[in-house]
Protein backbone atom coordinates (compact mmCIF):
# COMPACT_ATOMS: atom_id res chain seq x y z
CA UNK A 1 0.00 0.00 0.00
CA UNK A 2 1.35 3.39 -1.00
CA UNK A 3 1.94 5.68 1.94
CA UNK A 4 0.06 8.99 2.14
CA UNK A 5 2.36 11.94 1.43
CA UNK A 6 2.28 14.49 4.27
CA UNK A 7 3.55 18.07 4.39
CA UNK A 8 4.36 19.49 7.83
CA UNK A 9 4.40 23.24 8.38
CA UNK A 10 6.33 24.33 11.46
CA UNK A 11 9.15 22.59 13.30
CA UNK A 12 8.69 23.81 16.88
CA UNK A 13 5.89 21.66 18.23
CA UNK A 14 5.83 20.32 14.70
CA UNK A 15 8.75 18.05 15.57
CA UNK A 16 6.22 15.86 17.40
CA UNK A 17 4.35 15.43 14.12
CA UNK A 18 7.58 14.78 12.24
CA UNK A 19 8.52 12.00 14.66
CA UNK A 20 5.07 10.40 14.47
CA UNK A 21 5.04 10.47 10.66
CA UNK A 22 8.57 9.05 10.49
CA UNK A 23 7.43 6.09 12.61
CA UNK A 24 4.15 5.56 10.75
CA UNK A 25 3.42 2.67 8.41
CA UNK A 26 0.62 4.62 6.69
CA UNK A 27 2.13 8.07 6.18
CA UNK A 28 5.34 9.45 4.72
CA UNK A 29 6.84 12.91 5.09
CA UNK A 30 7.14 14.61 1.69
CA UNK A 31 8.48 17.94 2.91
CA UNK A 32 8.72 20.66 5.54
CA UNK A 33 7.25 24.13 5.10
CA UNK A 34 8.82 26.80 7.29
CA UNK A 35 10.62 30.12 7.48
CA UNK A 36 13.95 28.53 6.66
CA UNK A 37 15.41 28.57 10.16
CA UNK A 38 18.53 26.58 10.96
CA UNK A 39 16.38 24.13 12.92
CA UNK A 40 14.02 23.55 9.99
CA UNK A 41 16.85 23.12 7.51
CA UNK A 42 18.66 20.70 9.82
CA UNK A 43 15.49 18.64 10.25
CA UNK A 44 14.85 18.54 6.51
CA UNK A 45 18.44 17.39 5.98
CA UNK A 46 18.26 14.72 8.67
CA UNK A 47 14.90 13.47 7.41
CA UNK A 48 16.02 13.70 3.78
CA UNK A 49 13.02 15.73 2.61
CA UNK A 50 12.72 19.08 0.79
CA UNK A 51 12.59 22.34 2.74
CA UNK A 52 10.01 24.83 1.45
CA UNK A 53 9.73 28.46 2.50
CA UNK A 54 6.73 29.34 0.32
CA UNK A 55 3.56 27.35 -0.31
CA UNK A 56 3.89 28.30 -3.99
CA UNK A 57 7.03 26.13 -4.18
CA UNK A 58 5.03 22.97 -3.58
CA UNK A 59 4.33 21.48 -6.99
CA UNK A 60 4.17 17.76 -6.28
CA UNK A 61 1.29 15.67 -5.01
CA UNK A 62 0.47 16.19 -1.34
CA UNK A 63 -2.18 14.00 0.27
CA UNK A 64 -2.50 16.16 3.39
CA UNK A 65 -0.82 18.95 5.34
CA UNK A 66 -0.33 19.49 9.06
CA UNK A 67 -0.07 23.16 10.06
CA UNK A 68 1.71 23.24 13.41
CA UNK A 69 2.26 26.98 13.73
CA UNK A 70 0.72 29.22 16.44
CA UNK A 71 -2.53 30.88 15.44
CA UNK A 72 -3.50 34.46 16.31
CA UNK A 73 -3.92 33.67 20.02
CA UNK A 74 -0.29 32.57 20.10
CA UNK A 75 0.98 35.49 18.03
CA UNK A 76 1.29 33.46 14.83
CA UNK A 77 -0.38 33.11 11.46
CA UNK A 78 -1.07 29.38 11.39
CA UNK A 79 -4.68 29.80 10.28
CA UNK A 80 -3.64 32.00 7.34
CA UNK A 81 -1.09 29.39 6.28
CA UNK A 82 -3.80 26.74 6.53
CA UNK A 83 -6.06 28.85 4.31
CA UNK A 84 -3.32 29.14 1.68
CA UNK A 85 -2.80 25.39 1.70
CA UNK A 86 -6.54 24.70 1.56
CA UNK A 87 -6.79 27.06 -1.41
CA UNK A 88 -4.55 24.62 -3.28
CA UNK A 89 -7.06 21.85 -2.58
CA UNK A 90 -4.86 20.10 -0.01
CA UNK A 91 -6.64 18.51 3.01
CA UNK A 92 -5.32 20.27 6.10
CA UNK A 93 -5.03 19.54 9.81
CA UNK A 94 -4.63 22.69 11.95
CA UNK A 95 -3.06 22.74 15.40
CA UNK A 96 -5.09 24.40 18.14
CA UNK A 97 -5.99 26.68 19.80
CA UNK A 98 -7.77 28.62 17.08
CA UNK A 99 -10.36 31.39 17.29
CA UNK A 100 -13.81 30.59 15.93
CA UNK A 101 -13.34 33.21 13.19
CA UNK A 102 -10.12 31.49 12.09
CA UNK A 103 -11.89 28.13 12.01
CA UNK A 104 -14.81 29.51 9.99
CA UNK A 105 -12.44 31.20 7.54
CA UNK A 106 -10.56 27.93 7.01
CA UNK A 107 -13.79 26.04 6.44
CA UNK A 108 -14.91 28.69 3.97
CA UNK A 109 -11.62 28.41 2.09
CA UNK A 110 -11.54 24.62 2.12
CA UNK A 111 -14.05 23.99 -0.66
CA UNK A 112 -13.97 20.24 -1.28
CA UNK A 113 -10.71 19.76 0.66
CA UNK A 114 -11.03 18.29 4.14
CA UNK A 115 -10.24 20.59 7.08
CA UNK A 116 -9.97 19.63 10.72
CA UNK A 117 -8.79 21.15 13.98
CA UNK A 118 -6.58 18.50 15.56
CA UNK A 119 -7.92 17.02 18.85
CA UNK A 120 -5.07 14.52 19.08
CA UNK A 121 -4.78 14.41 22.88
CA UNK A 122 -7.94 12.31 23.10
CA UNK A 123 -6.17 9.63 21.07
CA UNK A 124 -3.01 9.17 23.14
CA UNK A 125 -3.00 6.08 25.35
CA UNK A 126 -3.27 7.65 28.85
CA UNK A 127 -6.28 9.71 27.73
CA UNK A 128 -7.83 6.74 25.91
CA UNK A 129 -7.48 4.72 29.12
CA UNK A 130 -9.11 7.52 31.12
CA UNK A 131 -12.01 7.85 28.68
CA UNK A 132 -12.53 4.10 28.65
CA UNK A 133 -12.64 4.10 32.47
CA UNK A 134 -15.12 7.01 32.42
CA UNK A 135 -17.35 5.09 30.02
CA UNK A 136 -17.30 2.00 32.24
CA UNK A 137 -18.05 4.03 35.36
CA UNK A 138 -20.97 5.81 33.65
CA UNK A 139 -22.63 2.43 33.08
CA UNK A 140 -22.59 1.61 36.79
CA UNK A 141 -22.97 4.96 38.55
CA UNK A 142 -24.47 8.42 38.16
CA UNK A 143 -21.85 11.12 37.69
CA UNK A 144 -22.41 13.92 40.20
CA UNK A 145 -19.41 16.15 39.58
CA UNK A 146 -16.53 16.74 37.16
CA UNK A 147 -13.44 18.95 37.39
CA UNK A 148 -10.81 20.04 34.90
CA UNK A 149 -7.43 21.47 35.87
CA UNK A 150 -4.95 22.26 33.11
CA UNK A 151 -2.48 24.73 31.64
CA UNK A 152 -3.91 27.37 29.32
CA UNK A 153 -1.89 25.84 26.46
CA UNK A 154 -4.10 22.75 26.53
CA UNK A 155 -7.43 24.22 27.65
CA UNK A 156 -9.05 23.42 24.29
CA UNK A 157 -7.88 19.83 24.61
CA UNK A 158 -9.03 19.66 28.20
CA UNK A 159 -12.55 20.77 27.27
CA UNK A 160 -12.56 18.25 24.43
CA UNK A 161 -11.44 15.44 26.76
CA UNK A 162 -14.01 16.46 29.37
CA UNK A 163 -16.70 16.43 26.69
CA UNK A 164 -15.68 12.92 25.63
CA UNK A 165 -15.79 11.75 29.25
CA UNK A 166 -19.22 13.30 29.83
CA UNK A 167 -20.68 12.00 26.58
CA UNK A 168 -20.80 15.37 24.84
CA UNK A 169 -20.99 19.14 25.31
CA UNK A 170 -24.38 19.70 23.70
CA UNK A 171 -25.85 21.52 26.72
CA UNK A 172 -23.68 23.79 28.83
CA UNK A 173 -23.78 26.87 31.04
CA UNK A 174 -21.05 28.92 32.67
CA UNK A 175 -21.57 30.20 36.18
CA UNK A 176 -22.35 29.11 39.71
CA UNK A 177 -23.97 25.68 39.74
CA UNK A 178 -25.91 26.62 42.87
CA UNK A 179 -27.63 29.39 40.93
CA UNK A 180 -28.60 27.17 38.01
CA UNK A 181 -32.27 26.26 37.93
CA UNK A 182 -31.70 23.81 35.07
CA UNK A 183 -29.84 21.18 37.10
CA UNK A 184 -30.92 18.78 39.80
CA UNK A 185 -27.58 19.48 41.47
CA UNK A 186 -28.53 23.03 42.53
CA UNK A 187 -26.58 23.79 45.68
CA UNK A 188 -23.80 21.37 44.72
CA UNK A 189 -20.80 21.51 42.45
CA UNK A 190 -17.44 23.18 43.02
CA UNK A 191 -16.72 26.58 44.52
CA UNK A 192 -13.45 28.26 43.61
CA UNK A 193 -11.58 30.70 45.84
CA UNK A 194 -8.27 32.27 44.82
CA UNK A 195 -5.76 33.97 47.06
CA UNK A 196 -2.13 34.20 48.19
CA UNK A 197 -0.45 32.44 51.11
CA UNK A 198 2.97 33.89 51.78
CA UNK A 199 4.14 34.66 48.25
CA UNK A 200 2.45 31.63 46.68
CA UNK A 201 -0.77 32.00 44.65
CA UNK A 202 -3.28 29.40 45.84
CA UNK A 203 -6.63 28.17 44.60
CA UNK A 204 -9.19 26.38 46.74
CA UNK A 205 -11.60 24.18 44.80
CA UNK A 206 -14.23 23.07 47.28
CA UNK A 207 -16.77 20.43 46.32
CA UNK A 208 -20.10 21.21 47.99
CA UNK A 209 -22.10 18.11 47.10
CA UNK A 210 -23.71 16.62 50.21
CA UNK A 211 -25.55 13.30 50.41
CA UNK A 212 -28.46 14.01 52.75
CA UNK A 213 -28.71 10.32 53.57
CA UNK A 214 -25.04 10.11 54.55
CA UNK A 215 -23.66 13.55 55.39
CA UNK A 216 -20.31 12.11 56.55
CA UNK A 217 -19.56 10.61 53.15
CA UNK A 218 -17.93 13.22 50.83
CA UNK A 219 -17.39 12.35 47.18
CA UNK A 220 -13.92 13.93 47.37
CA UNK A 221 -11.39 14.01 50.19
CA UNK A 222 -8.25 15.86 49.06
CA UNK A 223 -6.23 16.51 45.95
CA UNK A 224 -3.39 19.01 46.12
CA UNK A 225 -1.13 19.35 43.07
CA UNK A 226 1.76 21.77 43.67
CA UNK A 227 3.51 22.71 40.40
CA UNK A 228 7.14 23.82 40.74
CA UNK A 229 9.38 25.61 38.28
Model-derived segments and their meaning:
Residues 1-47:
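N-terminal Rossmann-like dinucleotide-binding module
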Residues 3, 29, 62, 87-89, ...:
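A general structural motif
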Residues 8-9, 33, 68, 118, ...:
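Short hydrophobic segments within beta-strands
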Residues 50-108:
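Beta-loop-alpha module in the N-terminal Rossmann-like domain of NAD(P)-dependent dehydrogenases
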Residues 64-86, 120-138, 157-167:
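Hydrophobic, well-ordered secondary-structure segments
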Residues 93, 98-161:
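A contiguous active-site-proximal alpha/beta segment in oxidoreductase catalytic domains
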Residues 143-218:
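Rossmann-like dinucleotide-binding domain that binds NAD(P)(H)
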Residues 222-229:
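Conserved small/polar residues in nucleotide/adenosyl-binding loops
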